[in-house]
């Protein structure tokens, strides 16, 4: 049965936990209208298709009933104005529940099909594109291979369930990771990842229109290095190219992912879709013409309001969870709060949720030099007093509108004369440095590769060599943005890996030596003895 919540259609099987009441500004959100059809429930009588009026209302509105077309088990409302007792409760004892038994027209389509703008063939095509996105870098994994073996069957079955609103997220796999920090990760089933990419491909281009320029996480053309470049640009602007002192506000949100309120997240997403649905992309083409807003509403609601801990499969020992603080675990999150880490939609949802906060900092507080990556924000200003005055307003906005708060220990103001750290980079006057933690991680990766090649007594598969090459180039490529070639030289100059890999003079990249490559091209397995 469909129900209305703030004039937005939900599916009744998707629970909306409201253990924490949403702010008044969210509850007062204007009605969301993705199409021009009426969302009011069925009334007594039927809708005249010619005039648009109601016919055969009669004296008694008895069409809400526990049994189809039955008056015996429902309240009987008398519309006769001369009747002293307009509400006839003669069947009150049997009126335990009601459901609509008459529609506007006798030939109305089922709601799930009526709201579907896409044809099933178009949905199959979009699911195929989503499948290709979901399997990137994972094509040789078991789940994508199993899906690919019966590709047409799985795609058609998934499209049918989405088209008829029968799709529900499957139980997730839960495990603990320890690098770079200990975290709890919920991995969705591969089919659910396909659906997540379907929704992402639908609404991400539209969401990009609402985000500020300096929101860096999980956006095409943005990322950590882009964020570092912008932060360095802010520093140079505030200090007038390092000629004057300036100050940096480091703002961190406490327990961000675990404290996201699902009801607020859903309403923010609905407001965003409603705001841009009628806007034009090009001449005569609106977003509503190319994006099925009702499908986006259905999928986003199903994903947001799912409980990841329901029937989840834990991988690992229960002891793996002991070092994890309870406030960082979904198993201890209050009902109706928290989204999982490990899903492509979680990344987009995190940006949608904090978009009002970004707009507040930029437009209301006047922080021109403000940028954010997930829950870590930086603001640069010429005076310390300005930043100090902004902190209470920022914290108040987070608490009143988003039910979040600034971390009291990690939120601080520092001078640009000292360390200016953001996203693993320390930006100084003449150059940017890589933080010690990143250098230590690169050293650990090199030592691990050395142990694999030196201490292993069995031949290694050809893939192992190319995996090692990818790991080396990932670290060297990142360090090259910080001009850390001297550090890379100290780590790799005397390494046994030099017998397998050749490094560029500035240590920006590595390649497999030609003589080693010839061996790998001849044999699937090879053992190179290093000294």
Predicted region positions:
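Short, conserved non-catalytic motifs in the polymerase core
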Residues: 47, 139-141, 170-194, 210-222, ...
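Non-catalytic, polymerase-adjacent accessory regions of viral genome-replication enzymes
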Residues: 107-156, 522-531
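Active-site-proximal segment of RNA-dependent polymerases
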Residues: 108-109, 114, 200-261
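Right-hand nucleic-acid polymerase module
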Residues: 188, 193, 197, 320-336, ...
